[in-house]
Regions:
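C-terminal segment of classical bacterial N-terminal signal peptides
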Residues: 16-25
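Beta-sheet-dominated interaction scaffolds and their linkers
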Residues: 27-57, 99, 175-189, 197
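Terminal connector regions
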Residues: 115-166, 246-275
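Bacterial N-terminal signal peptides that target proteins for export
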Residues: 1-12, 21
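Intrinsically disordered, low-complexity segments enriched in serine, threonine, and glycine
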Residues: 184-275
């Protein structure tokens, strides 16, 4: 007969559910808002991250670094065996504080910077900063201590949100391309699917716009599309705006637009015919 192991349930209670908002200005999980949701450090100059508790109760969060890799579908997965570059990225990031308690509607700043060791090769280095909620311990009640049969456990999810922290050393360049544009259906609704490619020494980050002649607004748009340096290609499908679904046929132009200090820059553009 299989033995009952309560430790496994306790381990399950510590699992982290990681969520990210599609809005580039802020990310939120539970009652925590984080802004910005993407940090790029060029050289040794640091920056700040703003955290805000929009809930009604005091909340505590632990802040830590994680290594993650992007898969071709855009998912981020844990890194079981870090490369030397990933180890260097983790070692060079400095941040404080590492634990915060936020009263309701009281923002707080996190200071973050990078200190690259002498002799480190030029390139792009990336870690992910995790903000994980710490639940206050609950008092043990009489009802919880008197179980008629066996042992019962209440699993409390522990939520967190991550943001990428990118360090760029040297004069890094990147090129992008769009290929294999075609129409698909997702959940019974039209979507524009394509392959997004990247080459060069840095990642890319921007928004995809699907434009149709004679229509002012994009018939499909998605912000916050990244291709990190571990990938050269991603497969993407963007839902067509419900109000413009009838226009999802015939000639279109697909753009990948990156926001830079000088303004929007078109990284890639292609014409296609949707059928």
């Amino acid at each position: 007969m299989t033995s009952f192991d309560p430790a496994r349930l306790l381990i399950a209670a510590a699992c982290i559910a990681v969520m990210a908002s599609p809005t580039p200005a802020q990310a939120g999980v539970g009652d925590l808002l984080v802004a910005p949701t993407r940090i790029v450090l060029n050289g040794s100059r640091g920056t700040q991250i703003i955290l805000n508790n929009i809930g009604d109760d005091v909340a505590t969060y632990r802040i830590s670094l994680e290594l993650r890799r992007m898969t071709p579908d855009g998912s981020l997965v844990d890194v079981p065996a870090p490369s030397e570059a990933e180890k260097a990225a983790e070692a060079m990031i400095l941040y404080a504080p590492r634990k915060i308690t936020l009263p309701p509607n009281q923002p707080q700043t996190i200071n973050i910077a990078a200190r690259a060791p002498a002799g480190l090769a030029d390139g792009e280095y990336r870690v992910h900063l995790l903000f994980r909620a710490i639940h206050a311990p609950r008092p043990v009640t009489a009802a919880a201590t008197t179980a008629a049969k066996g042992i019962s456990f209440a699993l409390t999810p522990v939520y967190g949100v991550t943001i990428p922290v990118i360090v760029r050393l040297g004069n890094l360049q990147a090129k992008a391309g769009i290929a294999n544009v075609h129409l698909v259906r997702e959940g019974g609704k039209p979507a524009v699917a394509f392959d997004l490619t990247r080459s060069g020494s840095r990642s890319t980050f921007g928004e995809i716009r699907v434009m149709k002649a004679g229509i002012k607004d994009p018939i499909a748009i998605q912000r916050g599309i990244a291709i990190y340096t571990e990938l050269t290609q991603r497969s993407i499908a963007i839902p067509v705006d419900d109000k413009l679904a009838a226009a999802a046929t015939g000639p279109v132009t697909v753009q990948y637009v990156e926001t830079t200090e000088m303004g929007p820059e078109v990284l890639a553009e292609t014409a296609a015919v949707l059928r």
